[in-house]
Amino acid sequence: MTAPGFVEFPDSPFHLYQPYPPAGDQPGAIDALTEGVSDGLMFQTLLGVTGSGKTYTMANMIARLGRPALVLAPNKTLAAQLYAEMREFFPRNAVEYFVSYYDYYQPEAYVPTRDLFIEKDSSINEHIEQMRLSATKSLLERRDTVIVGTVSCIYGIGNPGDYHAMVLILRTGDRISRREVLARLVAMQYTRNDADFTRGVFRVRCETIDIFPAESPELALRLTLFDDEIESLELFDPLTGRVRQKLPRFTVYPGSHYVTPRETVLRAIETIKEELRERLAQLIADGKLVEAQRLEQRTRFDLEMLQELGFCKGIENYSRHLSGAAPGEPPPTLIDYLPADALMFIDESHVTIGQLGGMYRGDRSRKETLVQYGFRLPSALDNRPLRLEEFEARMRQCVFVSATPAAYEQEHADNVVEQVVRPTGLVDPIVEVRPAHTQVDDLLGEIHKRAALQERVLVTTLTKRMAEDLTDFLSEHGVRVRYLHSDIDTVERVEIIRDLRLGVFDVLVGINLLREGLDIPEVSLVAILDADKEGFLRSERSLIQTIGRAARNLNGRAILYADRITDSMRRAIDETERRRAKQIQHNTDHGITARGVSKAVRELIDGVVAPAGHDALESAVPAEVLTDEKAMAREIRRLEKLMMDHARNLEFEQAAAARDALNALKSRLLLDGVGWSG
């Protein structure tokens, strides 16, 4: 086997880290898809089974073709997983993350039946906002960029032309006055704060201006002027003040995607006034005097804010005026920042394509009510996500990636490439059908067998009530079980999955487990209760996806509890058998012995999901601490303080990671018999 290392391709700016050479169906899939892109095919499908290394195939394609890429995932959890993997494959290149930056979002809405107006309320995740700004900066600055995102990328952000026009390029030796630098920074939506130096802030001390770029995770810029000339540019650590690097040139990007040049704002104010006059005349003619008065009051306040500050609360509702677009034209989105020759990958496309089509309709109905009752001008309807046909018109050369492609992919794909044989030699699980009338007792017996072997079990039911009852029943019979449902947020869901992998409990019960993008090599049994109840949760696609959750384990098995075999079951079983036969044949022909997947329980993404606290003695505690009693005591105190600090700052994921490291260290103390008193 070839040693791990970096691989470069001719005319490609990417440095691909290959932990292992492509194997199984990967080499053929990479060649076929790369050739398809080179031949100009617009749409291709990678039909890749669970655990076949689809992300690795994508990374190899990107590196070979040497083009910027956008990878879309159906949810934040999967996007974080893909982002972590892409960072491993491209540690020397720009791998960026673009998802919704709202931790909490209550959109502006009006309920006519109760005469209730709900103000927009939101909580923005600072870290994700920084990553979004970093993503657009990378797209504008460099070719070796991979962006991992969700459907958030079809929502309007600032016009790329305006955004690019507002950048501040600084070079040593350039003549520029202090007043001009400060005015430019304010126009770019940076705020002056000489006391609290954080992202999107600048501070001034005589001829020195410190700027903390909005897209920078940790370094700030120090600009020193002498007699209206830039004397030096230095990157420094805002925490310690230590200079890291002297620079001949630096580009400061705007503090927000919605930044707009002054002349554009002034032009927009005039067109907003014109639209307001027309709309007021229409409302008054219709006898809607309350609505007219409400609209005039709200819009005039926004116009005053735009005149004085250049922005206002809810500025996105005036995006059509600011971008100069015609009524009905789609808003600028992340897709507009992509170069024309970029690649697109739509992961789990059978889910993601449906999301792309559904976003527009829900947004439209809410906004129409706001416009009808005088809360917004009609132009607010153009601040919206793209419609599916608009997204299609902006798509670059695209690869749909799914184990179960839906009708859309089948209609559009010019080329379908199968990736069925796994690099590890693992084969699809054995599928059994057992009677439904004894399903709970039979399942209990199977769980005890798996738990004895330190293996995990996934159980999928049809209803929330049944999942709760089953969880109670299993718990009463001594099974360590948890229940995963839609009310659990993203972070807690990741923690539950992590605890399952670590053996904190043995059985996870859920209703629609397949949508979680579960990647759990420890799961050796998937049990599907009431598999013969035809419908969305028991369709062919759902069954194949759920069966695939056991495909990463050497002893993988799926049990379908049913009293009859439905058409969906038959097709799912036949497809699994077809893949299994192909995999076994490949292993036989090449003398491959299947080996299980051992995958570290790792952090997904800083600031999105907790850094791994498990295996914490290796990851969070220096090795020398483990051999020194005093150092261990100091480390425990440090971790306790860190945990409390994170909790005070409401950073619960990091607090949980510190707690895990603390527990691991205390366990080591107990095991080694070292006494310690706090």
From Swiss-Prot:
GO molecular function, one term: ATP binding
Family: Belongs to the UvrB family.
Domain of life: Bacteria
Family annotation (NCBIfam families): PRK05298.1, uvrb
Residue stretches spanning the membrane: none
Protein name according to UniProt: UvrABC system protein B
Motif Beta-hairpin per record, residues: 101-124
Entries under Gene3D superfamilies matching the protein: 6.10.140.240, P-loop containing nucleotide triphosphate hydrolases (3.40.50.300), UVR domain (4.10.860.10)
Domain Helicase ATP-binding, residue spans: 35-422
GO-annotated cellular components: cytoplasm; excinuclease repair complex
Residue ranges of domain Helicase C-terminal in the record: 439-605
Assembly: Forms a heterotetramer with UvrA during the search for lesions. Interacts with UvrC in an incision complex.
UniProt KW keywords: ATP-binding, Cytoplasm, DNA damage, DNA excision, DNA repair, Excision nuclease, Nucleotide-binding, SOS response
Taxonomic classification: Bacteria, Pseudomonadati, Pseudomonadota, Betaproteobacteria, Burkholderiales
Pfam families the record matches: Helicase_C, ResIII, UVR, UvrB, UvrB_inter
Cross-referenced PANTHER family: UVRABC SYSTEM PROTEIN B
Domain comment as written in the entry: The beta-hairpin motif is involved in DNA binding.
Compartments it resides in: Cytoplasm
Functional note: The UvrABC repair system catalyzes the recognition and processing of DNA lesions. A damage recognition complex composed of 2 UvrA and 2 UvrB subunits scans DNA for abnormalities. Upon binding of the UvrA(2)B(2) complex to a putative damaged site, the DNA wraps around one UvrB monomer. DNA wrap is dependent on ATP binding by UvrB and probably causes local melting of the DNA helix, facilitating insertion of UvrB beta-hairpin between the DNA strands. Then UvrB probes one DNA strand for the presence of a lesion.
CDD domains hit by this protein: DEXHc_UvrB (cd17916), SF2_C_UvrB (cd18790)
Residues that bind ATP: G48, V49, T50, G51, S52, G53, K54, T55
One Gene Ontology term from the biological process aspect of the record: SOS response
